[in-house]
Amino acid sequence: MEKLIIAVDGTSSSGKSVIFKKVARILNYQFVDTGLMYRAFTWYCLFKNIDINNQDQIIKLLDSFDYKISDEQIFVNNINVTNKLISSEILNVINKITIIPQIRNYMVKAQQQMVKNKGYILVGRDITSVVLPNADLKIYLDCDIEIRAKRRFEQNVENKILGKSFKQIYQDLIKRDQVDKTRKIGPLVLVSDAWYIDNSYLTIDQVVDIVVNKVHQLESQK
């Protein structure tokens, strides 16, 4: 059976990474969170002490940027950066980098090149609409916003991240949805041929089972 190229988009905090990492392990596919590519490049800019306000310097750094994934570990120029990508330093400046059209074009091409060999699950913004419009399976994962906020709040409590109340998280998600759906470049959209999954009242494992069964069905038709 031939493996597929799977593209996953959807609302923030709807469980995309958690669910599709599990799906990838079961199917022996390569999971790629495309958002981490932007974080990795941001880390590289900081590592090289580039002036974050100098777009020419940032663009030039693409020439030496080497990004690889191996056994769920992320490497930039052979440095394992997996545990460095959630730092506040990166999050504070990443928006100055992602708005540069040349950076975005580079990332889109790199992501498209990545899946020349099948057996990939790519998760991220505009994956189904812009990056992989011809993917074998396109999925849009959604969830009720109140349930998303509740899950995020409970995760934070479990991980002892106590900075935000449920109400603050809920309001943040409302703003995030609005920004994602209205941004000029690569807005969040539900494309007409995407498989829409609402996981508001499904467990992670239930969604995983549904997706794995669907992939097996499609693989058998190849």
UniProtKB/Swiss-Prot annotation:
UniProt entry keywords in alphabetical sequence: ATP-binding, Cytoplasm, Kinase, Nucleotide-binding, Transferase
EC number: 2.7.4.25
Annotated localization: Cytoplasm
Highest taxon, organism lineage: Bacteria
Binding site for ATP: 10-18
Keyword Zinc assigned: no
Record-level Gene Ontology MF annotations: ATP binding; CMP kinase activity; dCMP kinase activity
Gene3D superfamilies associated with the record: P-loop containing nucleotide triphosphate hydrolases (3.40.50.300)
Cysteines paired by S-S bonds: none
Location, primary (coarse class): cytoplasm
Catalytic activity: CMP + ATP = CDP + ADP; dCMP + ATP = dCDP + ADP
Gene Ontology BP, a term: pyrimidine nucleotide metabolic process
Pfam families: Cytidylate_kin
GO annotation, cellular component aspect: cytoplasm
Keyword Magnesium assigned: no
Record family assignment: Belongs to the cytidylate kinase family. Type 1 subfamily.
Name recorded for this polypeptide: Cytidylate kinase
Gene: cmk
